[in-house]
Design a protein with these regions (language model features):
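Extracytoplasmic/periplasmic substrate-recognition and gating elements
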Residues: 28, 32-33, 42, 59, ...
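Periplasmic solute-binding protein
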Residues: 73-83, 102-141, 166-188, 199, ...
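Glycine-centered hinge/linker elements that transmit conformational signals in sensory
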Residues: 152-156, 188-219, 261
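Hinge/lid segment of periplasmic solute-binding proteins
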Residues: 72-126, 149, 157, 175, ...
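Short helix-initiation/N-cap motifs at beta->coil->alpha
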Residues: 43-53, 73, 145-150, 215-228
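Long, aromatic- and glycine/proline-rich binding clefts that accommodate carbohydrate-like moieties
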Residues: 5, 256-259, 307-356
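Conserved N-terminal structural module of periplasmic/extracytoplasmic solute-binding proteins
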Residues: 4-83, 93-97, 141, 263-266, ...
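Paired acidic/hydrophobic, glycine-rich loop segments that form the ligand-binding mouth/hinge
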Residues: 66-69, 233-238
């Protein structure tokens, strides 16, 4: 029996992908499946404005927005504030929770025995190489730090570097955390000799001109653009950049592609991040919100999301098992199986702390 539109449950979601045609298709499919009316609203694209706007909505008890997409930085702040509905009873039950990266959930999504978000999209920090520049240096792959020197010596132009990065003050913590993990240190403990060694190694890359001093003002957009133009032999960048490289027509096994992690020091580990849904405590449509979240957190919903969006879902079992037509999925599976996955080191004042460290 078809329910009339009057009886349909309604839901309003503020979402980072509101303008994305694929996401609109996913929502249309979900509306049919759940027999629900879903309105999607845009959020600001600039990270600081976005955090400020969402913070205001939640703090003011605004009832017009039910679900909001947030990143690691936002959940790290909001989960302490009492604005969010806990989800462990209705959505993120033990069984569902087991399908997500465990250490990540504990570190990012949970607080005081409650779980406050449902991750839907996973970003994994991958090692990307420009195969043309490696080939020119006589290398098949970059296995260790010695290969950086070989690569650097083979580069023809003074504005080309073996390694590229984004060291602008709001971005550098991604790389700091990555290198500290390689050295087995602790980002929150700068008295730890391993932490110090990791930072010293990054400084030595600069001193030995393996990486560019110009990147102190670069965010990911600038780093990606230089990488696309053949200025860098390799970079660390999240899987989310895949679309950018595909659109620029530089992705491929003989061009720019994801590669196994080199052995820098003692550990092979990498950062992961997600986009996740949170439920506004002030929402008057909690039943509808729970149904939507149960679906997106489920194996079926997560698979549907990955197939329509062509991006990696947050459920590890879906990435492992499903026949998802995603470039580079075999390399992503290798990372999930063989390397330690770390949440980035974020604290309650996440945005401020990240910039201060930078």
């Amino acid at each position: 029996v078809c329910s009339s539109d009057l009886d349909k449950q309604k839901l309003t979601i503020m979402h980072i992908d509101a303008d994305n045609k694929r996401f609109q298709d996913f929502i249309a499919e979900t509306e049919k499946k759940l027999d629900m009316e879903i309105t999607v609203e845009k959020c600001p694209s600039n990270a600081d404005n976005r955090q400020a706007k969402i913070s205001t909505i939640l703090a003011s008890g605004d009832q017009n927005i039910d679900l909001i997409s947030v990143n690691d930085e936002m959940i790290s702040e909001f989960k302490h504030k009492g604005y969010l509905e806990p989800l462990e009873k209705n959505v993120m039950t033990e069984e569902v929770r087991d399908s997500f990266p465990q250490e990540y959930l504990e570190s990012i999504c949970e607080e005081n025995g409650h779980i406050y978000s449902v991750p839907f999209q996973m970003d994994i920090m991958m090692f990307w190489v420009n195969q043309e520049l490696l080939k020119q240096a006589g290398l098949d792959e970059i296995k260790d730090t010695g290969d950086f020197d070989i690569l650097q010596k083979s580069l023809k132009n003074s504005d080309q570097y073996a390694y590229g990065d984004a060291w602008e003050n709001t971005h550098v913590y991604n790389s700091l955390a990555q290198f500290v993990n390689f050295w087995g240190g602790d980002y929150f403990d700068w008295t730890d000799p391993k932490t110090q060694d990791a930072a010293r190694y990054m400084k030595s890359m600069l001193d030995e001109k393996i990486t560019s001093p110009a990147q102190f003002v670069d965010q990911y957009e600038q780093m990606e653009e230089k990488f696309i133009r053949g200025k860098y032999g390799c970079v660390f960048m999240y899987t989310g950049a895949l679309g950018t490289f595909l659109d620029a027509d530089v992705y491929g096994k003989n061009k720019i592609h994801m590669a196994p992690l080199p052995m820098f020091h003692e550990k092979k580990s990498t950062n992961i991040a997600t986009w996740q849904y949170v439920l506004n405590n002030a929402s008057e449509n909690k039943d509808a919100a729970f149904r939507f979240l149960q679906y997106t957190a489920s194996y079926e919903g997560s698979t549907e999301y990955a197939k329509i969006m062509k991006s990696y879902p947050a459920r590890v079992d879906v990435i492992e098992n499903e026949d998802i037509d995603l470039e580079g999925i075999d390399m992503v599976r290798k990372y999930l199986r063989e390397y330690t996955l770390n949440a980035r080191p974020l604290c309650e004042n996440s945005m401020g702390a990240v910039s201060d460290m930078g």
